[in-house]
Amino acid sequence: MGREKTLCKSWSDMKKHLNDTVSKSFIGRFFKLEARKTTFTTELRAATATFLTMAYIITVNANILADSGATCSINDCSTVASSSPPGPECVLGSNPGYEQCISRVKKDLVVATSLSAMVGSLAMGLLANLPFGLAPGMGANAYIAYNVVGFRGSGSISYHTAMAIVLLEGCAFLAVSALGLRGKLARLIPQTVRLACAVGIGMFIAFVGLQMNQGIGLVGPDKSTLVTLTACAETDPVTGACLGGKMKSPTFWLAVVGFLITSFGLMKNVKGSMIYGIVFVTAISWIRGTQVTIFPHTPLGDSNYNYFTKIVDFHKIQSTLGAISFTEFRKSEVWVAFATLFYVDLLGTTGVLYTMAEIGGFVEDGKFEGEYAAYLVDAGSSVVGSALGVTTTATFVESSAGLKEGGKTGLTAVIVGLYFLASMFFTPLVTNVPRWAVGPSLVMVGVMMMGVVKDIRWGETKEAVTAFVTILLMPLTYSIANGIIAGIGIYLALSMYDVVLGVAKWLNGVRKRVMREHNQVSSVATVEIV
């Protein structure tokens, strides 16, 4: 016992010495560690929590964009058994040449995703001094992959043109941010909508964490009720529908243990609790031969395990870098896609960034320190991402995990950027953190973001209805932007009566003044005649 106390004291003294040294150094002064009442180890812990909850985007984004075929085309299809040259249908089958191209593109996109996240996060930390991580956002990637380019290039716009659209939209958004219009637009959003955004985004994240493809698998699709309780031992790999063994999924119960570890740690104020749950579940899932392993004894599992055992691997981007073309910009579909992306960015990402600032306690009188630089970085990162071959890069709502761990300065964002840099070399490890390890943390993020619901004035019908619609639509429409738009729309509609009444009173006052002046003039004229 005495030895343990000595070790604990030594560790505590060493940590204090490290924190004091960093705080007094150039790094500490640059990031204002003492002014914001934080330490290096706190920022490191916050960055680790943020990165671990964001890391899933590396593989998810790569897989979604690869579904579009990316830079692969019919020219990559190989001729099978000396038959005639392959036709357009070769991209939909299992053509060896095309599949090899898809495999290469996925590796390109993994590196591109990490690189764009690194650049965005570093810029946010160094230029805005805010603890927010950036990465290619969910939503825009699916829109580009499945609606614009189409599955394996089946849409009307090529991947090269799609990246040109992202580039142009990023430049336009950067201009709006540079002119200071983005911050003003954010402050025009009613306070009740801003507060509801925090709650709605939390529910959105928690909903993602509960799903099969990105979380613990507690909920899944149902033909009658849309969603239902699942956690099934057998599920459809495509739809996620339950095929049998409801509530008997081993990975779900392992995720529950991870969630309880995180919850207990937070309940006892244990620093790093968000990390411990993820690390525990991941470590168990890396053991082969168990029911919860991420490496089953299948051809795919063996392939993933062989890649995992490499530990260190760096892939040089071969095809997506600079894959930009403006040749199709005469098509009307191009401008529809541009308008859609710009609209989502203007309302969605602005709301997310402002909400993160509110959750972190940075907002005072509707503004926050580093706001202008933050908006520029958030917009400019999309320009960088498009050049690398990925979609819109934006502030991630998972940054709230780092805020919960005490992140208060840009040092958190810088460390997140360095983690993404490291992930480019440790892709075999990072890409094999299972979804059921990340899911519990996403649910916990939803729990902590629910706290601001108490600040909404539920006794005021206009604010209550606005907040409820905003919160409800974010998870149910699977869109943060939809919730914001609906909330603002409801608020404006309910405010119209007061506006019309105010205008009517003003016009009535003007009429009375005119009549009074007219009567005075008439009286004077009468006196003069007499």
Curated annotation (Swiss-Prot):
Main location: membrane
Taxonomic superkingdom: Eukaryota
TM spans (from-to): 46-66, 115-135, 161-181, 199-219, 247-267, 275-295, 334-354, 383-403, 410-430, 436-456, 463-483, 484-504
Membrane topology, from the record: Multi-pass membrane protein
Disruption phenotype: Resistance to 8-azaadenine and 8-azaguanine, and, to a lower extent, to 5-fluorouracil, but not to other toxic nucleobase analogs. Deficiency in the uptake of adenine and guanine.
Family membership: Belongs to the nucleobase:cation symporter-2 (NCS2) (TC 2.A.40) family. Azg-like subfamily.
Protein name per the record: Adenine/guanine permease AZG2
Protein's organism: Arabidopsis thaliana
Lineage of the species this protein comes from: Eukaryota, Viridiplantae, Streptophyta, Embryophyta, Tracheophyta
